[in-house]
Amino acid sequence: MILGEIMEVLAFKNQSLIDHVNDMVKYWERIKYRYLKTIKRALEALNIKLDIEKVDEFMKILIKLHDIGKASKIYQRAIINDQEKLMGFRHELVSAYYTYHILLKKFGDKNLAFIGALTVMLHHEPIIMGQIRNLKKKELTAEVVLDKLKKFDGMIEDFEDLIKKLIGYSIGDIIKNDSNKDDIIRFVIEMSVRARHTPNSEKLRFIVGTLLLPLVMCDYKGAESREGKAPKFAEVLEVESYVI
């Protein structure tokens, strides 16, 4: 389902979050039959069994929520006003927090929610890992998480309405509407530790990699209508979508 206009929450300076999500969903509808069975088999590696319709629903939730962290006050201030700075803030860490809780509510499976949230958290992996290396760290440590979220000061006033339009749930029925920064920091640190030290870490990386390809493809395709220079990944996108 393509979403109607809600409010002017921006994903990019020249594209609203809703328009970005709509374009991503449209592109997913074009390519999904190439990926649904592969994703289904990948999830089965961790004994997560979903039928094709549920896999489709799962992926659409990732698409709709992957940038929900951009509905944070700090991000909207920075994108509207060039004088405002993000100060290292990474929206995907906030997106992962909400994605986990919404997936858990929707599917009732902690492992599936974790995988989905981790995928969302890593959908800009080259950026965040590059920033970590600049801090002379090798991984998403507590210190790094604190640095990336230190300026986070909550979500926009109409966040609950935005979530309800995107996924049909009231966020107040799932978690606190204006989650405490400490809650998000604690969650991201726990995710990072679990991802590195789980006994099934190799399977986990395989599954997340399987999910990241179509998610990132849709993300870049969904940004095509914005003004500005096309991202380099667009070259990969053209190869992947050539026969569609």
Swiss-Prot record:
<feature type="binding site">
    <location>
        <position position="91"/>
    </location>
    <ligand>
        <name>Mg(2+)</name>
    </ligand>
</feature>
<keyword id="KW-0479">Metal-binding</keyword>
<dbReference type="GO" id="GO:0051607">
    <property type="term" value="P:defense response to virus"/>
</dbReference>
<keyword id="KW-0051">Antiviral defense</keyword>
<keyword id="KW-0378">Hydrolase</keyword>
<comment type="subunit">
    <text>Monomer.</text>
</comment>
<dbReference type="Pfam" id="PF18019">
    <property type="entry name" value="Cas3_HD"/>
</dbReference>
<dbReference type="InterPro" id="IPR038257">
    <property type="entry name" value="CRISPR-assoc_Cas3_HD_sf"/>
</dbReference>
<dbReference type="GO" id="GO:0046872">
    <property type="term" value="F:metal ion binding"/>
</dbReference>
<keyword id="KW-0540">Nuclease</keyword>
<feature type="domain" description="HD Cas3-type">
    <location>
        <begin position="10"/>
        <end position="221"/>
    </location>
</feature>
<dbReference type="InterPro" id="IPR006483">
    <property type="entry name" value="CRISPR-assoc_Cas3_HD"/>
</dbReference>
<comment type="similarity">
    <text>Belongs to the CRISPR-associated nuclease Cas3-HD family.</text>
</comment>
<dbReference type="GO" id="GO:0004527">
    <property type="term" value="F:exonuclease activity"/>
</dbReference>
<dbReference type="GO" id="GO:0004519">
    <property type="term" value="F:endonuclease activity"/>
</dbReference>
<feature type="binding site">
    <location>
        <position position="123"/>
    </location>
    <ligand>
        <name>Mg(2+)</name>
    </ligand>
</feature>
<keyword id="KW-0269">Exonuclease</keyword>
<feature type="binding site">
    <location>
        <position position="124"/>
    </location>
    <ligand>
        <name>Mg(2+)</name>
    </ligand>
</feature>
<feature type="binding site">
    <location>
        <position position="67"/>
    </location>
    <ligand>
        <name>Mg(2+)</name>
    </ligand>
</feature>
<keyword id="KW-0460">Magnesium</keyword>
<keyword id="KW-0255">Endonuclease</keyword>
<protein>
    <recommendedName>
        <fullName>CRISPR-associated endonuclease Cas3-HD</fullName>
        <ecNumber>3.1.-.-</ecNumber>
    </recommendedName>
</protein>
<comment type="function">
    <text>CRISPR (clustered regularly interspaced short palindromic repeat), is an adaptive immune system that provides protection against mobile genetic elements (viruses, transposable elements and conjugative plasmids). CRISPR clusters contain sequences complementary to antecedent mobile elements and target invading nucleic acids. CRISPR clusters are transcribed and processed into CRISPR RNA (crRNA). Cas3 plus Cascade participate in CRISPR interference, the third stage of CRISPR immunity.</text>
</comment>
